[in-house]
Amino acid sequence: MKLKNQLTFVFIASLSGFITLSVSNDTIKATIKASAASQTLRILNWEDYIYVPESDEDEPSIIDQFKDDYFERTGQRIDVVYDTYSTNEEMYSTLTLGSNNYDLVAPSDYMIERLIRENKIETIDKSAIPNYLAYASPFLQDLYEKHGWDVYAAGYMWGTLGILYNKEVTDAIDMTTWKVLWDNKYQKEISVKDSLREGYFIGLAYVQNEALEALKVEYEDGLLTAVDYNEAISNLLNDTSDETIAKVKVALDKLKGNIYGTEVDQGKNDMIKGTVSMNTAWSGDAVYAIYEAADAGHDVLRYSLPLEGSNIWYDGFVMPKGANKDLAQAFINFVSDPKVAALNTNYIGYTSFIAGDSVLENINSYEGVVETPTEDTYELDLTYFFEGTLDTMDIADAVLYIEPDYVGGRLTTQYPSADEIIRSAVMRDFGDANQKVIDMWAEFKATDGQLWMYIVAGATIALLVTYALYSFITKNLSSRRRRYALLARKK
């Protein structure tokens, strides 16, 4: 009996240990499962287009914040693969020719149109992006709907193309027209974007200047509605007829002799260093340059949108065919939170589609913004952007007053006025004229100076190759002669 009791005890103890071990193993497996990534979100975005920390004291990156937020809401760990590109065309090639299957990309307006036309992207389930519906500016949502982009895309960033200038060495009044780029008063002090579309645009603005000025007068005289005015400007600034392309080529050839050069990404740094005094710039790059120059003690850079008309652009998130829609839409919803949007805008310089209290509070803290207007302050009415998105703040808070010296600074660069938007055009896809514009731009880029550099470089390479071959042959002949001499001695 005693033995039986002992055996029973041993059995129960063993069973207890087995159960304990089983429970422990199950717990470990569950923990491992929870910590291991169950899915991977693959994002392809523009370079320098999302917040990342610069020190250990900074907030975590938006990518890391999203991963943590997703885990808190679902209990699932995810991975994020984040790749970048520098042009829409590079992105398009990656999507169509590459082997990577991305879930989310952020093309510009004209490229969104192309991807829709070619049936390369998925539709968006708007019920999955409540933050976007609640906080994306209704003005921008309406614009997406007008173009038919809203079915496929959710806006991410938007901005303009204008003139970044040094107010200490240029006249601000000159910056109100694109014609200043051709003014020999600023010869060799100007850099322009090494970009086919932006290059063609400034050429168009120069060629169409008289027609654009005439439209402006008609609008100001009440002969055109805002909608009709914007449509007329858009048609002029999207003209790709053979006659217009030829005129733009002549204009750009003339511009060639007046500029310091073209640049891809160096323009903002050249402005900060004072290498040039004027640069055709995207608004986000202008914000970066303005801020960095001021931070270095030289608050001399400002940004202008020419009065005859400018370019306005919109980048949006789309999901390529076969994307993980649930994960992609979860990310869109996360970055559409106003707090995340404010963090993003402060870091990259570009303007988020997202409005809301956090964003409005953020820009009210910008330099040059004052609470009480005076005779000299500039009124910037942003109710068009924030209306319908504020939870606690009053819409009257979206009317900001700026000290005169800060007009053209960070705030007015990031947030153009309603009047500036009316006279700005979205650039469309060039369509069948694309190759003609490409050829025209290539001819513009092939300046005499560049051709001479290519000739010199080619001749130098040819000489080096010839010398290397000569040295190789001479060395081998000498070696052979030595071997023959040794053999002759042995004989």
Protein language model features and the residues they cover:
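Extracytoplasmic/periplasmic substrate-binding proteins
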Residues: 67, 257-322
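Early extracytoplasmic/lumenal segment of secretory-pathway proteins
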Residues: 32-118, 451-453
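Conserved C-terminal helix/tail region of periplasmic/extracytoplasmic solute-binding proteins
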Residues: 388-490
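Sec-dependent N-terminal signal peptides of Gram-positive bacterial secreted proteins and lipoproteins
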Residues: 2-26, 461-471
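Mature extracytoplasmic/periplasmic domains
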Residues: 315, 320-413, 417, 464-467, ...
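Surface-exposed intrinsically disordered loops and tails
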Residues: 81, 134, 138-145, 217-237, ...
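Sec-dependent signal peptide cleavage junction
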Residues: 20-37, 472-476
